[in-house]
């Protein structure tokens, strides 16, 4: 059962006020991916959890302000609310475990950089924004990305200060 609309509306607004386009139906998801064949896009799987509120959504805002390199489009689906749209989105992420919050940077219709929940939990928005900026600068341009362009955040910068017993709930 989806979360109540009135509960998630402020969480949606945190991204839409930044110009992130919402995809609420499977048809909207398919149309976005059809259009993405020749461009770059950042897909955000939004969530009600604390790490989305404190880290993921603020990281999008910080990353947008931190660089001149940007994906052609910023898109989002809301896990726990837009259930069918989220399910369809995950079909485009075959082989990548489902998690939320979540980021995937696509280039020419293919995911080239992924930030899973386990890369968000325990890390602050500034660090996550740096990860996104690094990906934007590598993949969002006319030039081919470098051979050593990252595909995920550097695990050595994940979860600094967390106890060794910490387990992500992904």
Swiss-Prot record:
Gene3D superfamilies: Glutaredoxin. Residues 140-170 are annotated as: Disordered. Disulfide bonds: none annotated. Signal peptide: none annotated. It comes from the Bacteria. One of its GO terms (biological process) is cell redox homeostasis. InterPro entries: BrxB/BrxA. Belongs to the bacilliredoxin family. This is Bacilliredoxin SRU_1493. It comes from Salinibacter ruber (strain DSM 13855 / M31).
């Amino acid at each position: 059962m989806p979360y109540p609309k009135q509960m998630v509306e402020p969480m949606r607004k945190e991204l839409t006020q930044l110009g992130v386009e919402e995809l609420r139906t499977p048809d909207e998801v398919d149309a976005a991916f059809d259009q993405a064949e020749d461009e770059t896009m950042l897909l955000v799987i939004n969530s009600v959890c604390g790490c989305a509120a404190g880290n993921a959504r603020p990281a999008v805002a910080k990353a947008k302000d931190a660089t001149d390199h940007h994906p052609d489009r910023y898109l989002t689906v809301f896990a726990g609310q837009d259930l069918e749209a989220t399910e369809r989105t995950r079909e485009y992420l075959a082989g990548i475990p489902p998690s939320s919050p979540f980021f995937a940077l696509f280039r020419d219709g293919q995911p080239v950089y992924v930030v899973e929940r386990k890369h968000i939990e325990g890390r602050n928005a500034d660090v996550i924004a740096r990860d996104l900026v690094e990906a934007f600068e590598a993949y969002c341009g006319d030039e081919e990305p470098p051979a050593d362009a990252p595909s995920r955040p550097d695990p050595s910068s994940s979860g600094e200060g967390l106890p060794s017993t910490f387990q992500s709930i992904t």
